[in-house]
């Protein structure tokens, strides 16, 4: 009996603690997508013409997080058969990313978008060993040689590709990009900012389900009116 008397306060204290903790767990708050988002003008967050959903990315070729996310983005795009809209957003503190983006634009416009993607992938793979613009040029030169391409002495004599990179960066500033990579899954009607790369597939699944659930626009057959003459 004495033991029971000693145990009773312990049991009561344990039950009290459980009751105190339970409401806290029940009220655990889970943030919603885009909650507390700081994006400003989101008008550009649309898939390309003809696509219902896409991955929209602002990236910096000198950014380690971009290098880690790049293959996952491509795997997701291939898995779901959806396009990637890729924007250059070279950060001010990075010494060679802007020039590398210009080389990527050269390859995209002069060779092919696929070759530009391969170049970006090569730059990300070599990123840790690039400490200067000279290092970046060595990697670029090696890329051209291994792909059987003639490397121009001046890739952008008219400044066209520089303007394209600057236009992308201006779009990022307009959107309010504060870090790279900035990954967003977009449809014609909404977008979700993916702040954790691990949630990319789940986000695509969610938005793709919404897109598939949308009623298809009924095709209206124009009615031909008979032409009468007075």
List the predicted regions and their residue ranges.
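Bacterial N-terminal signal peptides that target proteins for export
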Residues: 2-11
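Bacterial N-terminal signal peptides
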Residues: 12-20
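Sec/Tat signal peptide C-region and signal peptidase I cleavage site
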Residues: 22-26
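Periplasmic c-type cytochrome electron-transfer domains
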Residues: 27-38, 133-141, 216-229
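A short beta-strand-turn-helix
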Residues: 35-53
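Envelope-exposed proteins and targeting segments
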Residues: 51-54, 80, 179-181
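Structural alpha/beta surface segment adjacent to cysteine/selenocysteine redox centers
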Residues: 56, 61, 67-145, 175, ...
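C-terminal cap of thioredoxin/glutaredoxin-like
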Residues: 141-230
């Amino acid at each position: 009996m004495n033991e029971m008397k000693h145990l009773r306060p312990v049991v009561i204290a344990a039950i009290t603690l459980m009751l105190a903790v339970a409401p806290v767990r029940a009220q655990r708050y889970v943030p919603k997508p885009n909650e507390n988002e700081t994006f400003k003008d989101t008008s550009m967050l649309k898939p390309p013409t003809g696509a219902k959903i896409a991955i929209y990315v602002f990236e910096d070729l000198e950014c380690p997080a971009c290098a880690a996310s790049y293959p996952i983005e491509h795997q997701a795009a291939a898995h779901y058969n959806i396009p990637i809209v890729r924007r250059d957003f070279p950060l001010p503190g990075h010494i060679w990313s802007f020039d590398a983006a210009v080389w990527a634009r050269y390859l995209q416009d002069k060779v092919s978008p696929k070759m530009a993607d391969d170049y970006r992938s090569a730059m990300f793979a070599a990123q840790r060993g690039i400490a200067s613009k000279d290092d970046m040029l060595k990697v670029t030169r090696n890329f051209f040689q291994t792909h059987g391409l003639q490397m121009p002495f001046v890739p952008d004599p008219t400044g066209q590709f520089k303007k394209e990179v600057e236009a992308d960066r201006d779009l990022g500033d307009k959107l309010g990009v504060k870090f790279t990579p900035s990954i967003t899954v977009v449809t014609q009607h909404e977008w979700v900012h993916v702040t954790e790369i691990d949630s990319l597939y789940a986000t695509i699944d969610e938005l793709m389900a919404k897109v598939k659930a949308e009623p298809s626009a009924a095709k209206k057959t124009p009615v031909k009116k008979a032409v009468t003459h007075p």
